[in-house]
Amino acid sequence: MKFIIGFLLLFAGLKAIGSVPYRFSESPWISESVADEGKYHMPGMKTKPKKYWSCVGVIPVDSRNSVDETDKMRGLQYHLLCQSLAGLTNRAVEKGKSEIAVWLCDHGGKTSYKLSRQALEDMGIHEQGMQNGLELACNEYSSVDGVKVQLKGMFDGYVLTDVKNNPESGVVASVASHVYNSIIVDIRDKEYFEKAGYKMKYDATRKTTVDAWREFRNKCSKRALVIMPVQTGELREFAIKNNLFVLNLNKELGDAGAGQNISLLEEVLTWLEPNAPVYGWEQGVSEDQFVARVSKSGHPMIPCDWSYNHSLLSLLYEKGREQVLPRIFDPRSIDFKKKKNFVSFFLSDGDNIQWMMQDFASRYYDVPEAEDVKMTFGLPVATLAMMAPVQFNNLMGLQKQNCSLMEMLGGGYYYVDTYSQDNNRKTNLRVAAKRLAVSMRQYQIKLLGIMAMDVKSEAAKEAYQVYVDANDQLEGIVVLQYSPYAGGEGEVFWVTNKAGYDIPVITVKYSLWDRIHEREGSPDFIASKLKEEAQEESFSVVCVHAWSRFEGDTYGASAAKRCAERLDDRFEAINMQE
């Protein structure tokens, strides 16, 4: 009843417009001008280079994180070299010491990187050429168009690693690199670089991540943290460019039993600025070992462990650029007299930045089945708009006519009922909600998807109120439970905003998941459960687990369509905003 009253109030406002054609840009619910306060808070690149090198042979080469390669242009050894080259060079641009940047060439041809690279050209930043990391580090080049394009001489030396015998040496070197302004070189290639004139500035071959923290904590920025597994090179460019600390949870790749840096993680999280983002991911460990700790300490996790070029992707993200806004659902199209069992399907894991940069659009989002079931998609609106604004605009432009969008999971991955419970929760939660509200209003996103460990807890309800208080344009919240997603059993909570409107907080009723649970299962199983509970009129939210596969290799929107096709004429699929 409260929801209907809210719509009646909205329609009263529409009617007051009179004979003038109604446009949503005139709606008091939509702000066309949003203050900058709180809008831009993630590390990004603010200085525009004049040119850039494309560094080849890294992305997405299968051997890029192997420690067993002998070729100097293969393996983790080469990967870390190239990441450090890019990070140090891009940092030099930021400091005004260079006009040439480094872009890690995507040999996979992903649309997101193509568009972002084209955006550099559109800004007048032109590719100087394609070279491998060895050439960029060691060759001499003449200036071009008055721009010094040679990288050799820009670095003070090298940091030595032994990634095969000491996995943590690569993590330590990722920090030492920005401290010593030195590229990362492994013992495998030491002789080659010394012949090219490089001198060792720091020996990380026997160092641990704990050693790096003790030695370098005072030389690292508190604005963010990178968590990545040993034996990986991803995100090092970003960490080096922004002077960040890099931490691995497992001391050996994918093996929690070989030792962990849990106490170090907790210490570093306490040291960070409040609400500072934590980038990356860890492998071979349950999320309650690291995401839960990140959340409790008052930081959002940014899943982006298999994405690249974050410095140049984020270039000038805070500057005004043409925005592609979402399709806004017109509530006047609703027949309020219709009696149906309404079902809305939405896709999980929309907080995942790397997924947005890879096959999300082609395999999950821009597909005909999404239109068929009026699918709702969660996007990392607040974070992607800062980290990769070109790809964000691309995704907004690909939105299907009958599909709706929502912010997923509130500016990073965290649990709203545990967020910052170890450190000044009320203040930090309000800051997170305010930042999120500014972003959602700017991009005209009206729905919010969030996650809680216990969706019915008092702490979760406290968070619902904070989000509603921060955003007077919020139309509704959808909340998942960490496990199971449908732990809220479809219960709806009502939260009153500052304007006096009651905003629905809807818990997930069922989820399509390739495992058996009372409220989780195959499309056929969930359809049968919905039919068993059919009434004259009802509303159910069904979350589609992004990584589940069902009979006939159905997944995502095709799995939702399969479920919808097994419902009868008592049901109707609608998008979440509808």
Give residue ranges: language-model regions.
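Preference for solvent-exposed, low-hydrophobicity sequence contexts
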Residues: V20-K319
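Hydrophobic h-region of N-terminal signal peptides that target proteins for export
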Residues: F7-I17
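Short, glycine/acidic-rich beta->alpha junctions
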Residues: Q260, M387, V431-A432, S457-A460
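Catalytic grooves of carbohydrate-active enzymes
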Residues: S263-G280, V343, S348-D372, A382, ...
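Positively charged n-region of N-terminal signal peptides that target proteins for export
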Residues: M1-I4
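Active-site beta->alpha N-cap acidic-glycine motif
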Residues: H310-M396
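Substrate-binding cleft of extracellular glycoside hydrolase catalytic domains
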Residues: G378-I445
